[in-house]
Amino acid sequence: GMVPGFVAGHYTLDQCVIQLEPLLKGTDITWLPRSVTALDANAKRVTLDDGSALDFDWLSVNTGPVQDRKKTGALLPGAREHGLFVRPIESFGALWPQVLAMAHTQPLRLAVIGGGAAGIELCMAVRHRLPKASVTLINGSSELAANYPERVRQRVSQALKARGIVVLLERASHIQAGEVTLESGATLACDMPLIATSAQAPAWLQSSGLALDEQGFIAVDAFQRSPSHDRIFAAGDVSTRMDQPLPRSGVYAVRAGPALLTNLTAVLAGVPPVPHLPPKNTLNLLSCGDHYAIATWGDYSAQGRWVWWLKDWIDRGFIKRYSRP
């Protein structure tokens, strides 16, 4: 996404998000700016955060993953009290300027907790924006960028080292004011921990009655349909393809959109749905903060300023495509 570019100072927050209300203007779609608090799949009812309920005949879920503060706080004590969560972007975007203001008064010691693509990109974005700050990546596992091919892991490691970012290949055990304690017992002085741990399934799915995977995400088949409730479909990071597990990536979420539309249209017309076949390889672009990026396509990889400009062109184009004046 474009959040690392926002952190690095390349974009404003408004340039990183798609405003749904203007996009839906002039359509027959009813826009409800609410959050879901409960889903009863058997009763075909969704409950919203204002207490209202919506009954449905068919349901499509694409709420995306969340950073469950309560769950994260249980796994990493002190995270809720002392950490800055990168999700949701609206909350993070409102608080990030306060970190920048702090950096004007003192050299900051920052730690990014979470060694996935989000944490890696965030580290390098912070380094670009705050060159005087010390930046540490607490990876959380024994291998950096574990989901990438070996050559890409080497590129990522070299990029972090070249930017003076310290990488710790162990987990954080708890956070308190001014420091992060690691599982080894060592402590790291830290003015602001940035929480970029793996996203989680929304808590309300647990009591929904839907078939879920081991991590609590909605299980779906090749039609993006729930195997337990055939009138409920799901796509994007909130779901898991049980026939073909996929990385939780925006690319796969976007590719599932047209297939979801096709199948919803089909079942409403009484026509059998068709399987969605995700591509074997997708273009993965990892930004390095300073107008530089690493590209991955299957086993092929490349890096350079041209990769960043390609990523910038793709990201801006996607936002523009779904934005209205």
Where are these regions (language model features)?
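N-terminal Rossmann-like dinucleotide/flavin-binding domain of flavoprotein oxidoreductases
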Residues: 1-58, 149-166
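A Rossmann-like FAD-binding core segment of flavoenzymes
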Residues: 31-38, 54, 128-222
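FAD-binding core/adjacent interface of flavoenzyme oxidoreductases
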Residues: 26-109, 194
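FAD-site-proximal beta/loop scaffold in flavoenzymes
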Residues: 79-106, 187-255, 262-263
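A conserved FAD-binding loop/helix module that cradles the flavin
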Residues: 238-289, 294
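C-terminal auxiliary extensions adjacent to catalytic cores
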Residues: 290-325
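Short glycine-rich anion-binding loops that position phosphate/pyrophosphate groups of nucleotides
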Residues: 64-67, 199-201, 291
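Rossmann-like NAD(P)H-binding beta-loop-alpha module
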Residues: 95-136
